[in-house]
Amino acid sequence: KNFNTIQYLKKGEDDNGKPIYVVVYNPFPEKDLNQLRKDKAILFVNNGIHPGEPDGIDATMMLMRDLATKKIKTPQNFIIAAISAYNSSGMLNRDSFARANQNGPEEYGFRGNARNYDLNRDFIKADTKNARSFQEIYQWLKPDVFIDNHVSNGADYQYTFTYISTNKERLGNVLGNYFNDEMQRTLLKNMEKKGVISVPYVNIHGDVPDGGFPAFVDS
């Protein structure tokens, strides 16, 4: 079904020459982002950077569906844009053995793209068409909030939801305190009310909790 609130736009190219698409939920008559940005917040979601980690793709499809059918009510100052599948070439390189510890599916894509690049390590160097396309998409959107969806690679995480959030020190005093003390706490409390228990994502590698775990840097 077609919805006038949903746009499906070709906005880049994978290393294999196939297009990268952006899905935009915009319930407003105005479609010019430069105009909308004046009084609207833009949320940008990246999906499928690692094939075999499909949860974010599925969740985004469900979210867009529920927004378009008005099952979910949103504030009247809000637009969502999402890359549907960032690493489409990796998704086409399918097997059943690259994620030995992960429970299903029976077949999935390979972590690297068509040139075997881990795109999660190419945001700054931009050796791939994918990364250069991402930069163009990001500058086109100029989002207020960015989310990059991942899934654990078969590790036994006990919590439903793990996250890496921006280090508050990197945001500056005012924005950093707002994000850490208000925005993030509100999000986590709202998720907990819905039965989703969350915890920061950490790499253990034999460490013990007594000395703490290092925080990830989001760059």
What are these regions (language model features)?
Residues 1-219:
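Structured catalytic-domain cores with a bias toward divalent-metal coordination
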